[in-house]
Amino acid sequence: MNWQHTPRGGYGYSVCVAGIVTKIAAKRVQIRVAVRSGNEWQQVTKWVEPARLSTREKPVPELDGA
């Protein structure tokens, strides 16, 4: 799925971030996303609002292992 992320101080623009749903709670969804740290990709978890999620059609090697 894609997460519509609005960075802090980002002047109101949103960025689509590819992620994988790991948990579903009453009001939020936990997702796993890839974050670049230097030359390496690391996977981190985030709690997000379900309204900020949409479907993803293309695989992402950093998340899917493809």
UniProtKB/Swiss-Prot annotation:
Portion annotated as DNA-binding: 33-52
What is an example of a GO molecular function annotated in this UniProt entry? DNA binding
Q: Which domain of life is it from?
A: Bacteria
Keyword vocabulary terms for this entry: DNA-binding, Plasmid
* Keyword DNA-binding applies: yes
For this entry, the protein name equals Protein KleD
According to its UniProt entry, this protein's organism is: Escherichia coli
Taxonomic placement: Bacteria, Pseudomonadati, Pseudomonadota, Gammaproteobacteria, Enterobacterales
